[in-house]
A protein has these predicted regions:
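Rossmann-like AdoMet
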Residues: 1-83, 87-132, 150
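A short SAM/SAH-binding and catalytic strip from SAM-dependent methyltransferases
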Residues: 153-168
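Conserved SAM/SAH-binding loop
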Residues: 133-137
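A short, conserved alpha-helix within the catalytic core of class I
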Residues: 138-140, 164-177
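Short amphipathic alpha-helix with an adjacent loop that forms part of the alpha/beta core around
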Residues: 139-150
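Conserved beta-strand signature within the Rossmann-like core of class I S-adenosyl-L-methionine
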Residues: 180-194
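Rossmann-like AdoMet/SAM-dependent catalytic core
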Residues: 199-279
Length: 279
């Protein structure tokens, strides 16, 4: 029997936030698979999180919509492979199974075994999956063993990961990817503040970040105040970046965000997206 405690409660809460999206006045996406990975406890936690600190669930909702569009546009532009990196219960491989791209997943063994068990119970097949700690594994090589073509145009969705990772691990990992994958676009979310030193411009910024950590019951060791680090220390260019708060108008939720207190809006501005493209 798979020990779901090895997966972590956060994955179930994130799935529950997605599962509760139809309850919103203006839903941003439809994820019919999310309830498979939810339960009463996780849904209660998601509702409590939304009531106590709405920006935390707004972040998840906005990023889900953003990464959906990243995949859709990338496939339209010719990408033929999509890698879901550390995606937990991400079901985009099934949402976009008829879009003309091959999907692959990379995550910890406990996560993917549990996911495979749930999918099997629902008559759905897990896509080719590499069971690994991606920071330590040969990801391109491991995926190639599953039918992945490292030379083909590839999208990588790196959602909800960077802020949890040891800062010293990220550039070596990206350089390993770049050395084997010449046509790679990788999208991720991040906090645009220096979480390593915890030196913020103002005490208010620190308090905002700590508020998110408390809401998510997590600690974030890594942020990127300057995206040029990816261009200096790895062979990538920044193809796209911005704050999730700026997407509120596009998503039809500008009025909702405008009504947030100043602190909440400033918190959303710290949470950003970035797309890197192999040079």
């Amino acid at each position: 029997m798979i020990d779901i405690n090895e997966i972590g409660a956060t994955a179930f809460v994130i799935a529950s936030i997605r599962a509760l999206e139809p309850e919103k006045p203006r839903p941003l996406f439809d994820d019919p698979y999310a309830p498979w990975f939810s339960n009463d406890r996780a849904r209660t936690a998601a509702r409590q999180l939304d009531a106590a600190f709405p920006p935390s669930t707004t972040m998840v909702r906005f990023r889900t919509r953003y990464f959906n569009r990243f995949v859709e546009r990338g496939i339209e532009d010719g990408a033929r492979q999509v890698v879901l990196l550390g995606g937990g219960f991400d079901m985009r491989a099934h949402h976009y199974r008829d879009a003309g791209a091959a999907f692959f997943e990379v995550d910890q063994k406990a996560v993917l075994e549990f996911k495979r068990h749930i999918l099997s119970d629902n008559g759905v097949e897990q896509p080719p999956s590499l069971f690994a700690n991606y920071l330590e594994a040969d990801v391109p090589g491991g995926l190639a063993d599953l039918g992945f073509d490292p030379a083909a145009p590839t999208l990588m969705v790196w959602e909800g990961n960077t802020m949890y990772l040891p800062p010293e691990s990220i550039m070596p990992f990206l350089n390993r990817l770049a050395s084997a994958m010449p046509s790679l676009r990788i999208a991720f979310d991040y906090f645009s503040v220096d979480l390593q030193s915890r030196e913020f411009d103002t005490d208010e910024d620190l308090k905002r970040l700590e508020g998110v950590e408390r809401a998510m019951n997590a600690s974030f060791p890594t942020g990127f105040p300057d995206l040029t680090v990816f261009e200096r220390e790895a062979p990538f260019g920044v193809a796209e970046s911005g704050t999730f708060a700026e997407l509120a108008e596009e998503y039809g939720l500008g009025e909702m965000v405008a009504e947030y207190p100043d602190d909440w809006r400033e918190t959303l501005k710290m949470y950003r997206y970035c797309v890197l493209e192999r040079r």
